[in-house]
Amino acid sequence: MANKEMFEDTVEERVINEEYKIWKKNTPFLYDLVMTHALEWPSLTVQWLPDVTRPEGKDYALHWLVLGTHTSDEQNHLVVARVQIPNDDAQFDASHYDSEKGEFGGFGSVSGKIETEIKINHEGEVNRARYMPQNPCIIATKTPSADVLVFDYTKHPSKPDPSGDCSPDLRLRGHQKEGYGLSWNSNLSGHLLSASDDHTVCLWDISAGPKEGKVVDAKAIFTGHSAVVEDVAWHLLHESLFGSVADDQKLMIWDTRSNTTSKPSHSVDAHTAEVNCLSFNPYSEFILATGSADKTVALWDLRNLKLKLHSFESHKDEIFQVHWSPHNETILASSGTDRRLNVWDLSKIGEEQSAEDAEDGPPELLFIHGGHTAKISDFSWNPNEPWVICSVSEDNIMQIWQMAENIYNDEEPDIPASELEAQGS
């Protein structure tokens, strides 16, 4: 039995390597930018910070990322890294692709382009880290314990204390177990939601400050789910609405103004397996998406949750992340266990396809990022550079990439009249 499994693993490894080689060969045609960076330890979390600096006279801009570590037994850290991304006018052409380093974009080597700026000691691995929109120096993290930690990174030295002591600025209490889901309210400063394996969602208001020491108790605990709560997200336009998804296969919509914390405003059987993630559309107040272990992303309208608007089908395994693009109302992306990050375009749903195109996936599947050879742990859309995504996988790899413009810009190239006549004759 073990031999059969070993054989299957070897075959899978071979297939993965073969697919990666093909992907690498095709990057110059599929991407305007690819930066591949091996982190010292895998990160389970990634998020672009909102700041960008454009140094005068340079052909790049500086961006920052929030990362974490997942070490074997060594000290873990919350990490802020600085990234140089070339400007659009920097040289991009296929001859600049460095097949050894897996980089592309007129841009020598990645070494020196991605630098760790701040490392803060952390208790156990960082399951997820998210900055507070009203003050991006404040970062909340999920730990392997039940506590949610809050760090103001301006109050910590950039090099961690060698003792390994973790001293968060706040410790948020309320959960009994660890989890992953974490969401700051973009309309109410300091309001933080967290999802947990203990079947609950906790809400804190950190603007009130701790009663004593550094501990803040939950303001409310929502107990509607009957299984592990995988993810939670505030609505982006209504300060009192949020959604949660869980292993009970349900999507729940909650209103913090309600006088009950045990019953959501709406509950939907969203998928045929665990629901792992959700994302509200930043442009359309009624639209949200959920991703599931049933390998699909579902599209929902808050005005009629009884009816699933659409099911996006192409992933070969569980979906753990789904995020709408910050720049385009109809674009969302999803990723997970199948090592693929899929970018979808709602506006293409129902478009006619040739049989050949249909083999690659439905018309709304705009792009498949195939650069990872291990499960994708998290990804983030860059808020300042449209179509730039950073994705991290379990094998320590971080990729910063942008699909080729001709993929998302549908305009047909102008064909000179002389050629048109030749075609028509």
Curated annotation (Swiss-Prot):
Q: Which GO terms describe its biological process?
A: chromatin organization; DNA replication
Record bears the keyword Repressor = yes
Q: Which GO terms describe its cellular component?
A: ESC/E(Z) complex; nucleus; NuRD complex
Subcellular localization(s) per the UniProt record: Nucleus
Q: Name one Pfam family in it.
A: CAF1C_H4-bd
Q: Where are the WD repeats?
A: 47-122, 128-173, 181-217, 228-269, 275-312, 318-369, 376-403
**InterPro entries per the record?**
G-protein_beta_WD-40_rep, Histone-bd_RBBP4-like_N, WD40/YVTN_repeat-like_dom_sf, WD40_repeat_CS, WD40_repeat_dom_sf, WD40_rpt, WD_repeat_RBAP46/RBAP48/MSI1
Keywords associated with the record: Chaperone, Chromatin regulator, DNA replication, Nucleus, Repeat, Repressor, Transcription, Transcription regulation, WD repeat
Q: Which SUPFAM superfamilies match?
A: WD40 repeat-like
Establish whether keyword ATP-binding is in the entry: no
Q: PROSITE patterns per the record?
A: WD_REPEATS_1, WD_REPEATS_2, WD_REPEATS_REGION
**Predominant subcellular localization, coarse grouping:** nucleus
What is the recorded function of this protein according to its Swiss-Prot or TrEMBL entry?
Core histone-binding subunit that may target chromatin remodeling factors, histone acetyltransferases and histone deacetylases to their histone substrates in a manner that is regulated by nucleosomal DNA. Component of several complexes which regulate chromatin metabolism.
Spell out the family assignment given in the record's similarity comment: Belongs to the WD repeat RBAP46/RBAP48/MSI1 family.
The subunit structure is: Binds directly to helix 1 of the histone fold of histone H4, a region that is not accessible when H4 is in chromatin.
> What is this protein's name?
Histone-binding protein RBBP7
Q: Provide the species name.
A: Xenopus tropicalis (Western clawed frog)
